[in-house]
Amino acid sequence: ANAKYYHDALHDALTGLANRSLLYDRLELLLERGKRHPETFAVLYLDLDGFKRVNDLFGHSVGDKLLVGVAERLKTCVRPTDTIARLGGDEFAVLLD
């Protein structure tokens, strides 16, 4: 039961992606690790243009399906060591490690 609560606290309920809190935790670990062993990493920020219009025209259920679709597509584009997070609304971040 505790593992489920822990997972739920660190993941977005809609997409299953990491949430902002987990992204920040992993970024902090990378920065700390970088002090000892300099490495290269990147943070990508993505915002879906026109997403509000999708919700307004087609409803939130369609908007939710779009967000889930974007999440699934992003998962196919990164390595297992990378972190994809939904920051909220239509904002995503990818931590390339």
Task: For the regions a language model picked out, list residue spans one by one.
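Conserved long alpha-helical elements within nucleotide-processing catalytic cores of c-di-GMP signaling
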Residues: 6-10, 16-43, 49-79, 85-94
